[in-house]
Structures are given as C-alpha cells and as structure tokens.
Amino acid sequence: MPKRTDIQSVLVIGSGPIVIGQAAEFDYSGTQACRILRAEGLRVILVNSNPATIMTDPEIADATYVEPITPEFVEKIIAKERPDALLPTLGGQTALNTAISMHEQGVLEKYGVELIGANVEAINKGEDRDLFKGVVEAVRAKIGHGESARSVICHSMDDVLEGVETLGGYPVVVRPSFTMGGAGSGFAHDEEELRRIAGQGLTLSPTTEVLLEESILGWKEYELELMRDKNDNVVVVCSIENFDPMGVHTGDSITVAPSMTLTDREYQRLRDIGIAIIREVGVDTGGCNIQFAVNPDDGRIIVIEMNPRVSRSSALASKATGFPIAKIAAKLAVGYTLDEIPNDITEKTPASFEPTLDYVVVKAPRFAFEKFPSADSTLTTTMKSVGEAMAIGRNFTEALQKALRSLEKKGSQFTFVGEPGDKALLLEEAVRPTDGRINSVMQAIRAGATPEEVFEATKIDPWFVDQLFLIKELADELAAADKLDPELLAEAKRHGFSDVQIAEIRGLREDVVREVRHALGVRPVYKTVDTCAAEFAAKTPYFYSSYDEESEVAPREKPAVIILGSGPNRIGQGIEFDYSCVHASFALSEAGYETVMVNCNPETVSTDYDTSDRLYFEPLTLEDVLEIVHAETLAGPVAGVIVQLGGQTPLGLSQALKDNGVPVVGTPPEAIHAAEDRGAFGQVLAEAGLPAPKHGTATTFAGAKAIADEIGYPVLVRPSYVLGGRGMEIVYDETRLESYIAESTEISPSRPVLVDRFLDDAIEIDVDALYDGEELYLGGVMEHIEEAGIHSGDSACALPPITLGGFDIKRLRASTEAIAKGVGVRGLINIQFAMAGDILYVLEANPRASRTVPFTSKATAVPLAKAAARISLGATIAELRAERLLPANGDGGTLPLDAPISVKEAVMPWSRFRDIHGRGVDTVLGPEMRSTGEVMGIDSVFGTAYAKSQAGAYGPLPTKGRAFISVANRDKRSMIFPARELVAHGFELLATSGTAEVLKRNGINATVVRKQSEGEGPGGEKTIVQLIHDGQVDLIVNTPYGTGGRLDGYEIRTAAVARSVPCLTTVQALAAAVQGIDALTHGDVGVRSLQEHAEHLTAARD
C-alpha cells in the first residue's frame, strides 16, 4: 500500500557523539533516511548533538537542532516544532532509549506524536532480555528450532550470587538490559570477577537489570540482517559469519559475508528461525539484526539477541550487498511495502528481491590500545574497537588480506620473513583473543603447528584455519621460486598478496616488484557490486579490484577528480575527515567534475554509492591508489588527486604519488613537507618573523638533555610526523626524560624526537583558514577552555572566542596569512597558537582539513570544505564570494557581536577500558589525544552553550547538591572565586584537608573528608571514594599533581567514571561549569535550529 497521508512532519533522532559501539554508521543511516523522507515531501526535523556528522548539515533536514539528546531537550523541540511522528530507529541505542523514556513519561501522548519505524512493544520485546527469552520459546513451539541459553534475570547482587548456583557454576556471562556495544557485559570466571562485572552492569542498565547465562564460549557465531513490512513480506538481506568464535563482541571480531561454513540446510534453519522471530517480535516497518550461536559439535542453535533497529551490522550489510537498509527502513516507516520500493542499483528489481553475492566481503576491526597503555587488551563481550575497515574480493583469502592491509597499522599484514618463534608459546598466545591474534596464528603455522592444534587453541572454524594454511603455502612458493613468472605472480595477487609483502618475501624493494608486475602485464581489473550476481545490469558504479579477466570501468567524458578518504576510524582521525571528503565530492560534482571516491571504511557517508559519481572500495595504500589512477586514466581525463581532506593517511601518500607522475591538486607535496617537517617549518616562521616556543630535535638522550637544560623544564617531547599527539608527553624532570627516550623505540636520524619548551598557563587558540595563493579567508578562531598542554582534539573550545579582543584577532589573521603564504597552501590550513603573557607563539600548522572544520562550518554557517575543494582546482576566494559559496563580505574573524556562541566538547571512552586488575583507566587529559567523538552546544550566551555541551557529552551539570574539591597547589589561587560561586548557588562543599584550609582562610566553609590513602576514620567516617560510590557526591573537581599519577586522584577520578558523576580535571573547566550552572538556574534554556542561526548570521553580514 502506498505512502501514508496523515504524516506531514517527522522528527528524526540522531545518535549523538561517536563513542565506542556507536560510531559513524548511524550518521550514514540517518543521512540516508532524512534525504528519503524529504524526497517524499515530508518536513524533516532532526536532533543530534554531534557537529561532525553530515546529517546535521543544514541542507539535509528542514530544521536541524544541534542540541543534547536528552528527554528534556527533545521535549522542547517537540513543543516548538509540533511534529506528527517520531522516527527513533536510526540513531542507535541513544535514540531508542530517549524515545522509550519520552513515551513512558507521556510526552509523546501530550503533544500527539506517533512513534513510527518500531512500536514500543516490539522495542521492548527485542531489548528486554526476559521478554526476548519468551519470544524465542514461542518460536521453538511453532517451528521446533532455536532456543535461548539457560539464564537467570537478576536485579541485585544477592540475586546474582544465587543465579550462579542455579546455572551450575562458573564461567557465566553477564549481560545488562538496554545498553549497546556490550557495555557492562563480560565473562565471570569466579566470584570476585562476578561482583565487579555484575556491579557495573547493574549501574549501567537503565532498568537495573542483568541477565546471567550459561557460557557458550567457543561456539560459532552468525548474524542475519532482516527487513519486514506491514504486509508481512520478509527479506533476509545478508548473512554474516564471525571469524572469531563466541566470546568476542561481534564489533571486535573479523567478520565475513556471506557466511562461509554453513551447510545449505543449516542456513535454511537459521533463516526460518530469524523470520519467525521478526514476526513474533512484531517489527513491521523496518530492519533488525539477529545473532545466533551454533555448537560445532552437535549443531544446537542458540539465539543470542536481536536489535530492533538499524545497527552497526546493518551498515556493513548495506555496503557489502549494495542494499541500502536505512533508506528502505525510512520508506517502510512512512507506509510503503518492500515490493513497491525499487532497488537503486539495478533500477529494475524491487526491494523484495533478496541480494545475492558473487564475491566475499571481510571486515576487520581497528583498535587503539596504544592510547591506553594500562588497559587490558583481551577481547571480551564488551566492544573495544574504535573503527573498522572492509574489503571485497573474489575469494576469502583475497578479501582477508586486503582488509588487513586496509587497517593501516604497523604489523597488521601477515609477514613471512624472520624467525616465527616457538610453536608452543605462539599457540598459547593465540588462546587469548586479542587484536593481533590472527597474526599469532599465522606465525604458529609458520612454526609448524598442525590445523588440529590451531583449532584446539582458538576454536576458529577448521575451514578458516585451512584458508590461513593456503596463504602460508603460497608465501612458501613465492620464496622458493627461481624468478617471478606471470602465473605465480597472478596466483599470489588472486590471494590478496600486496607488492609490499611480495617484496619482503623476495628481499626486493616494493617499486621493483611493481615494475616487474607491470612488465609482465599482471594488473587488477575492477568489478561492480550489483546486488544480483550480474543477473541485471548495475546503474551505479561501485567497484572493487580483483585479478580477473574483464574490467567493468566504463569510459567517461568529464574530467575526473579522485578524492582519497581517511580509511578506518581511529582516535585522532575520525568522522570529521570523512565530512570534508563528502563535501568536496558534492561541491566538485556541482562544478562539473566527475568525482571518484576511494575509501575502505564501511561506516561512513563517503562510501555510500550515491555520494560520488564513482566509488572504489579499496585500501588506501600506494599500490592500490596507483592502480585506481591507472584505471581511471584509461577511462577518460583525470584532473588530479585530492589528498588534503582525509587526514594524515592520504597526506602521507602525496609525495610518492607525485614521484609516480600522478597530479596532486591543491597544496603541493613540497608545501606539506614545509609544514610537517620541524626544520623546514622553523625556517618559514623565521622568515615571517613569528615566535615559536624554543625547541630542538634530538636522536639520543644526551642530545635531548642538552636541549632541555638550555630551554628549562617542563618540556614537551614527541615524535615527528604523527596525528592525534601519539607518544607525546609533558616531562617535568631529567629522570622522566631519560625513561621516555629509553621507551621510544622508533627514534632514528630521519625520525628524531622533538623537544619543545612547554608554555604553562597559556591560552591555546585554533584557527581554520582558506588560502588561494593571493587572499586569506579566516574560517574561524577557536579559543580553548583548557590550557595549552592538553591535546586540541580533547579540549573544549568556544567560537567566537570569549576573551580575545579585536587586536588579538588582527594579529592572528596576519600570522595565519604569513604562514599560509610561506608554506604554499592552496585550500585549507589549520594553525595552533598559544598566547602566553602578551606573546603569540605558533605551536604547529597542518596543511590540510583539520578535525575542527565541521564544527567551524556549522558555527559560522559557511561550507569550508566545499570551498577548499574548489580552491584546490583553481577557483579563487573572490570567485567563490561572487558565487555566494563564501559570504560576499567579512569572514569568520569578523562575526557580528550578537552571533551565537558555539562550544565544542570532546567525548572520551574511559568507561570502556579496564586494566588487567579490573580497575578503570585514569581520566586525566594530556598532550596525547584520547577522545573518540565530540558534541556541540550553541546558544546566545557562553554559559548556556557550555552547559548544553556538557549535557550532550556527559549528562547535565548538577544545579544543587554536594561538590567535592581537591586541587594541586598551583591551582589553589584560581579555585577560590568559582568555589565561592558554587556556595552562592547552594552547593555544600566537601574538600580534602589541604584544600579545605585554603577555602576556610578565604571565608568559604567546606566539610573535610578523608582521602582514600587515609582509610576509614575511627568513627567509621567514609573516605571520599566511598562517598562517590555511595552516590553522595554530585560534582567533582580534581586536578592532578604533576605527571606522577598519585593514587588518590586516580581512585577519585575512576570512581567518578564508574558512577557517572561530572568530574572536572582543570580549573578552567570549573570556571566554565560555574557559568553553565549559573545559566541553568537563572534562565529558561531555549532551542534554535541551525537554519535560524544561519539566517541571523547572513542577515547580520549583509
């Protein structure tokens, strides 16, 4: 039946900041849905607090609210916009939980808003573990297959301890209700572990409910993606098999689509169970994902869980099959049925045809354990990966090897040279699942392990183990051959070996292997993803490489621009860079170019087949990019390759591309070197007469000590050429400097360590600007709230700046122009300054799109990334002003006085990591970046904007209750005024003895509490950590002492994370929070859409 006519406007809830377990895939699905709903003529209202997303661009929805996703704020938006319906299934767990709580509070009923896409009953049946158990039992009664693991529901610690007895002892699995990414879940092997995991699970579950179940470790794990409409048509979009057996969260496992090791009968059985479940739960206007465990010994099937919403797996399934689940879910939600929706890719077949694949897809996760040295790297049922890469091949080995090299991590590809090591040790290592387990398995095979031994140790299915043996046999053949002949080379390529691996095995250079390969005529062809195994013609060019016979790349007339994406998400290089690539693609298509996107990240908008004219789903290595350029050169004219938008990954390829004769447009490789290389950049600054903090480079401890002695401590030490501040540290004395140099393994004359003077108490400033060779456009000036020394990606910042005057902006503009000119930038540049005393120091310059571009663009209502792409291809700022792509006059440095103030706050993944003893990871910020995402708060005054940013990132600031203060000596003076403000707002202050003394002398009363190290008092007085755990503290201010992680502070901050109490670790954040608390208690906090803000800014500019 056709579209419903009673719905005129829809509110879509996004997923908020990127956290582990809920990443860019929801931006992809939300963007798809908003476009579809608007195309259907509905008014779309969107709420999402994350500015780095495409979906929060003003052109995607009719009214875009960058506001915290909390029931209070969403209610304000509903009251203002009065939508007819609410679609909550595209924003992950955040959106689902918000919608459910608004339904329960009666808000939806009060304003007459209908929930579409999933009804409350279906959501509860899918999410509530007890109800879902009932669903599985009902299905078993009907079709005779499928069961749940034996389990017990618990609401308290006593229930939990009894439950273990019922299930027959340890190990048991703990799973909380209504959480995502496996938060709070885990395997408990004894009582101590059980108390820890279940205690955290009860806290995290919004319904204080956990499920204990029998352990099914080592079983095979599968997933099905299904869709159902209200006429009861069901399609199975895709089957996915996990390479790792049960016990590793599916988001952390290598996964394969379609599933490889199921017999036809087993697959039909899973299908039958899946279809029966989606009917029983009652999902009738959308998609869902169901996870199964199969016992390899007797084939017993257990249904683990389902998600009645668009999930991480559905983004993967969409990219793997070309079947756009989110788009179709949005159409089903407004009344269409599957047989009425055409398949975009073939245009001939309806969405009720199930996709069939004539290729294999492998997804590999990307981790960031190097950022949290104390974290436990064992993989469990709690998701820990921060990103993923996907690859497509004609067989499993090709897809697997391509996926591993797409991860761009040292040591992620299989290596076949050097001694493998001891077989017994390697097999023992492979028992514990970690992010490098597949490499340990390969080394064990090289050391002589048998397939049976590998299976015993890892429980990885024998078929997969056999495939690993196949790869190893080919490597042996490559090593033993007299010379590389075309047959052997082609065979190696068909199994996914890269030129780098072949060169390593043969003891040659990569470029020599490539020359031989080209001379022998061994080159890849490109195949199309067409959803139907080539039964119908595909209308959308979505390619993957393979060493096959015929190429499917069609010739074209228009000049092509190849945009290199940013690869898998990781800390320091996330969705913000994808945002710039997508914008470039839109802008260049409009300007008449054929846009070609190269990327391997399945979560993103850039790898959607309708973002660019052609999409290559390929690894971002030199070899793969050169082959794509070659294929596109044969198809028609190539204007050039853009490397400045995808972060550090494509930037690192620019020189090599140029050396291979590929035109790099925009900022040339020489300019990138001038900004990245310390010596060259120092020269640019010297010529422009700009001060930088005193610095030097060293390759030994003696050299570093000499520099530090001359500059004076504290110093900032870091390796060269890194993104996200990897390996940076503030060093306060000589002994720590010595151990830092000793721990840094990668020091060499070509990669020295940089030693800078560290500016204490300086204001850090970030500038994003455009330069076309003649004119500078200042995009925005951001003032950091935390002091210099905290990585800019982790610091909160305000735009327009809140304490800088007109004169300061003039100086910033002149310095930025001098640097852009001196470096030779064409397009975007990001510069970090520090203001200490009255001197403006230059910290560093990045000749590329930075992670603040989306935030700056939204705060000033100017599409910077679009403008940068046009400048790369020769447009001038004057021309873009004439086209109104940039404002006709003024720029981000001359914003009107009543411009709204935007605050960006970083979101950290502390709660996901534990060390091996189960303790938390310390939450102190430093020069190494650790945040996974960001939120934005926007309002007419700073206090409210800051309060909104905190509510969006960590939950609302408290407006009453007890505040605990304990600060380092250097912070005691600056803490007095904010502390007095807190008392004025009616807070009761708690403090440790030293801080309480200073407060008392200044006339502020504070109750003294005991430190953790002092233990309980004689009368049973609790320590501060116990008070926090008992929920008796509402706000914590705790600044660390030097770099020594004094245990007191560590214990306090870890307790704060466990109980979700706001914890401020700098005095600057405290001062901002006080302004926020003030704004919350005095004013009525309103909401305005980005479109209203933009209208206001444009009117003021003209």
Swiss-Prot record:
EC number: 6.3.4.16, 6.3.5.5
Residues binding Mn(2+) 4: E844, N846
Residues involved in ATP 2 binding: R718, R757, L759, E764, G789, I790, H791, S792, Q832, E844
Residue ranges of the region described as Oligomerization domain: 409-551
PROSITE patterns in the record: ATP_GRASP, CPSASE_1, CPSASE_2, MGS
Annotated residues for binding of Mg(2+) 2: E305, N307
Residues that bind Mn(2+) 2: E305, N307
Residues holding Mg(2+) 1: Q291, E305
Transmembrane region(s): none
UniProt-annotated binding residues for Mg(2+) 3: Q832, E844
Gene3D superfamilies: 3.40.50.20, ATP-grasp fold, A domain (3.30.1490.20), ATP-grasp fold, B domain (3.30.470.20), Carbamoyl-phosphate synthetase, large subunit oligomerisation domain (1.10.1030.10), Methylglyoxal synthase-like domain (3.40.50.1380)
Region (Carboxyphosphate synthetic domain): 1-408
Cofactor (UniProt): Mg(2+); Mn(2+)
Entries under PANTHER family matching the protein: CARBAMOYL-PHOSPHATE SYNTHASE [AMMONIA], MITOCHONDRIAL (PTHR11405:SF53), CARBAMOYLTRANSFERASE FAMILY MEMBER (PTHR11405)
Name of the protein in its database record: Carbamoyl phosphate synthase large chain
Lineage: Bacteria, Bacillati, Actinomycetota, Actinomycetes, Kitasatosporales
Gene: carB
